[in-house]
Amino acid sequence: MTFNPETGKLYIQDVTLRVGMHAILHMYGTESVRTIAKALDDAGVDAIEVSHGDGLNGTSFNYGFGAHTDWEWIEAAADVIKNAVLTTLLVPGIGTVEELRRAYALGVRSVRVATHCTEADVAKQHIGIARDLGMDVSGFLMMSHMIDAEALAQQALLMESYGAHCVYVTDSGGALDMDGVRDRLRAYDRVLKPETQRGIHAHHNLSLGVANSIVAAQEGAVRIDASLAGMGAGAGNAPLEVFVAAADRKGWNHGCDVMALMDAAEDIIRPLQDRPVRVDRETLSLGYAGVYSSFLRHAEKAAEQYGLDTREILIELGKRRMVGGQEDMIVDVALDLVSARAA
């Protein structure tokens, strides 16, 4: 373990303006981005991530079209951020090194390079170029619940070897419990250098986002992802104001104003939600089935279109071990379920 929350300062990475895009179908207006980014910056978070929900260049028929371009969102945030590090996310194959360079030119100084948990090797070029640009770089191993701890650690080792300053346990499905988080971070400790930071990206589908983040910090994760009011895919991410309040009670140094975060969550974020970000029968099914949280809104749309229960689709997606990037298969699964019902 390389970090101790009892003695060190946590690095609070807000994801409201990236993962939170999924919750409102990538429809943040630029004025909302300014308002949210300023509130987060004023409240003392260390970093603010901004992009389409699926990362740079994510706007598409497959993932959903954004209300604005990544550049318009990033520029809006950059206009008001004075202290926090402006961050973005890039999924190789969706975003390219050209998008990365443009983001850097607009003021982005930290990037999370995200791959499926078994595909770290596709991140080599992007991590290397980000390092060449002088950026802070994290490796982001999505759907970390889908392989065991030792296998995940080997993927983390690859990301470290490419130059990542930090490697995350990324619980995209909100399917990990505290033991799963603990096991994965301990496996990281067995293979990663002490100077390589660890991070946790939790989702709240089983209502464990905050608990998993606390356990992660206790196991050496210094970078904690969270979002205002949990704004994010599925049941959302670890709610930022809740995590900070819990960390406060433990006496941990997080550098944030918990009351300001509460106000931002309640006054700014909740009114933007066209669908409540919460644990309900659909979002719980994501964690139960181990399904990519971003599939929620796509599955709800398909269920309505074909007269199905959203849970049926999500459970079947889990059985088929579908992963991020296979959003186009959700309709195929729905049609298969309709055919099976008619048979």
Curated annotation (Swiss-Prot):
Query: What is the protein name for this chain?
Result: 4-hydroxy-2-oxovalerate aldolase
Q: Name one GO molecular function term.
A: manganese ion binding
Which residues are catalytic? 22 (proton acceptor)
The residues that hold substrate are 172, 201, 292
Ordered alphabetically, the record's keywords are: Aromatic hydrocarbons catabolism, Lyase, Manganese, Metal-binding
Name all Pyruvate carboxyltransferase domain ranges: 10-262
Pfam family, any one: DmpG_comm
Q: Write out the GO biological process terms.
A: catabolic process; L-leucine biosynthetic process
User: Which annotated residues bind Mn(2+)?
Assistant: 201, 203
Q: Return the annotated site residues (Transition state stabilizer).
A: 18
| EC assignment | 4.1.3.39
Which reaction does this enzyme catalyse, per its entry? (S)-4-hydroxy-2-oxopentanoate = acetaldehyde + pyruvate
The Swiss-Prot or TrEMBL record describes its family as follows:
Belongs to the 4-hydroxy-2-oxovalerate aldolase family.
InterPro entries per UniProt:
2-IPM_HCS-like, 4OH_2_O-val_aldolase, Aldolase_TIM, DmpG_comm, DRE_TIM_HOA, PYR_CT
